[in-house]
Amino acid sequence: MWKGGNQEAVIEGSGGELGVPGSWGLQDAACHLARASLPIMFPWPLPLGSSALTMLLGALTSLFLWYCYRLGSQDMQALGTGSRAGGVSGMPDVCSQTGPRGLGDSGEGPRAEGLVSRRLRAYARRYSWAGMGRVRRAAQGGSGLTGGAGVMGIQRPGLLFLPDLPSSPFVPRDAQRHDVELLQSSFPAILRDFGAVSWDFSGTTPLPRGWSPPLAPGCYQLLLYQAGRCQPSNCRRCPGAYRALRGLRSFMSANTFGNAGFSVLLPGARLEGRCGPTNARVRCHLGLKIPPGCELVVGGEPQCWAEGHCLLVDDSFLHTVAHNGSPEDGPRVVFIVDLWHPNVAGAERQALDFVFAPDP
């Protein structure tokens, strides 16, 4: 006996007739359910028997699948609206108290924790929550979004802090041995590409094709990837650099944290202290032209580039860049690539690519 409100549906063995006024038989209950909920109508009443029960189960299954489809469609529509309104495309913002943004950082990103959480839930429905503990904690804001509580002092990522990642201002090259060796072996080709797109950096207006407006006086960049998007015209002009990027195993190329390109700093130029958007990435600097007097300070630790060699930096730490050389020394030029932090697992990378995917 099935009770619904104050009515009883009495299931008879063969006839399925109404027992008393106000009671439903199996046929009437199924007919009411079909008329009220299903987008596809079936002829009713049906003769009771194995075929009728099969059709009833089919109708209930159709109703369940239709409900799941509607729920998923509404959720994805909400995500799309939030993405356009919140500016998910482009590089997430950096620390509000810092200076100019770094290579490729456009200052755009999800403006609210709710949007990131909704995207993560959409990912889990499509795939799984397995291995998502740290990402889930970050998305819920416990340690994670916009720096979060517990990220103190010199490490303050502007958007996403993934908890429990080993961190230090400079990362050993062995942590990304394959990609470091590939980039260093590609040094001659990448240097030739820079020579093909270089100019006198005299502040000409408009800028030569492919070059972005200066981040600060004396600081220029030409990007092959910006915020997870390939820049086809620049890639065609730099075939050696593009070929090297395609061979990397840990290149962060599919989300808004990922950039790659040439960074030029003129003598006397300086980028004041700032923090990158996340600790889930490591920036690889390949030195191309390094005159005297150039310095990179990350988390209070000074370092200098070397031509033909890579330097791995966790730019979620507060860092400054300066070229203290003379005008005769020429510009400092490095090729910068954003790589995944080596301790971010494959499942976490896939989830972050989904959550922070650039808009089409």
Curated annotation (Swiss-Prot):
Spans within the Cytoplasmic topological domain: 1-45
Any Gene Ontology CC annotation: membrane
InterPro entries: Asp/Arg/Pro-Hydrxlase, Asp/Asn_beta-hydroxylase, IPNS-like_sf
Positions of transmembrane segments: 46-68
Broad class of the protein's primary localization: membrane
Keyword match Membrane: yes
Alphabetical list of Pfam families matching this protein: Asp_Arg_Hydrox
Entry's EC annotation: 1.14.11.-
UniProt membrane topology term: Single-pass type II membrane protein
Molecular-function annotations in GO: dioxygenase activity
Keyword annotations from UniProtKB, A to Z: Dioxygenase, Membrane, Oxidoreductase, Signal-anchor, Transmembrane, Transmembrane helix
Membrane topology, Lumenal segments: 69-360
SUPFAM superfamilies per record: Clavaminate synthase-like
Subcellular location: Membrane
PANTHER family linked: ASPARTATE BETA-HYDROXYLASE DOMAIN-CONTAINING PROTEIN 1, ASPARTATE BETA-HYDROXYLASE DOMAIN-CONTAINING PROTEIN 2
Protein family membership: Belongs to the aspartyl/asparaginyl beta-hydroxylase family.
Listed name of the protein: Aspartate beta-hydroxylase domain-containing protein 1
Gene it is expressed from: Asphd1
